[in-house]
Amino acid sequence: YSPSNPVTRAQMATFLWRAAGEPAPMGAHGFTDIPPNSYYETAVTWLIEQHITSGTSPGKYSPSNPVTRAQMATFLWRSNCPPAPPISALAVGGSHSCAIKEDRTVSCSGRNTSGQLGNGTANQSLSPTPVTGLADVTTISAGLQTSCAVKSDGTAACWGYNASGQLGDGTLTQRLTPTPVAELTDVTAISAGTDHSCALSQSGTVSCWGANGNGQLGDNTLDGISTPKPVPGLSDVTAISVGDRFSCALTSGGTVFCWGYNVFGHLGNGTTDQKLTPAPVSGLSGVTAISAGAQHACAVKSDTTAVCWGDNSGRLGNGIIDRSSTPTAVSGLDNVKTISAGVKQSCAVKLDGTAVCWGSNAYGQVGDGTNEDRLTPQPVSGLTHADTIGTGSFHSCALKQDDTAVCWGANYNGQFGDGTNTSRLTPTPVFNV
């Protein structure tokens, strides 16, 4: 038996896997130093799926390395601790993140200087903290310093920064806990941006509120308002997305309208002129999903390809850095399920459950194990079985098909919710403490 011999990481993986009953893993491990068909390959794959280990460095498991006492303790604790509570939806904000749990309550983590975590304090939290008094939530959105949620009865609530009235409660008062959005009773979706918010009604109409210095409320004025105001001329809307001082809407016919700030061409109408009312995105039809970032936007088409427009520096994914005021195809990307535009990065989930990201990567928000900016889509390292994806200022997160979540990029404020403020170049399990 060789009881005095040191235990390798390969052997430890095998011990744990066999102790669990040799379960069959669903996906792939993503490591380059695991020989195919090795005695420990299945065990390591299972460890990855159970979030017991993420390797020693990007793409490396180091199977021959001895297991330290610290690693042994961590392996055993993670293999025996209760699983993370299921997550039904994930929202990624500027430097915070929020999740809807199986019981339809909400928890948030990360930066909290304006109360965007909704827990009654202004203290940041490295671990998920429950949003006070919020239940029966169906959908959620995280903005730069605000958060908003829709409840099953069609009402909405927001919390956090409110200097422009973006919480929609008729005041400019910052809120540390959820406050009802005035006058809304039939909401199906909500989107929080930098200084304004918009909501979609069951009837397919849109209302917006907050700052309006660039026409982002779409009401043909530049007057801000702290309660919801209908966007005229929009009907049959199926999805909305709010960015930095601009808004976009997708209609049932597959067309997209955007309005507001446009200095980078991110309204997609071929100009850089701001629009006070919704304007169609040029040459775009057959759209199934949209996402508005800080100064760019992206869409998924019915043929499962993706396009982006606006400011670039890599975030359009077309291989160049020049901005575009009309939609441009994301290079080499097809079989797209959903897409998310962040501040300077974009990410997409493919139909096979893998994910890709592109754009600025200074904080590792592309998730490819490097800090190199990417002008075209790059696979997110080791991520399989992804369902949805979200992008913030400098971090990105994905909700997986097993209702667990992973994040990568900047974590200085604890926005991962993993109990640390350690940033990551590749996905790490989150909202699990």
Residue positions per predicted region:
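Phosphate/pyrophosphate-binding loop motifs in nucleotide- or prenyl diphosphate-using proteins
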Residues: 51
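Feature responds to low-complexity, polar/acidic, surface-exposed segments characteristic
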Residues: 1-43, 54-69, 78-84
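Conserved core positions of repeat-based scaffolds
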Residues: 96-99, 108, 146-149, 158, ...
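An edge-strand/N-cap motif at the start of beta-rich repeat modules
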Residues: 4, 76-115, 119-122, 128-129, ...
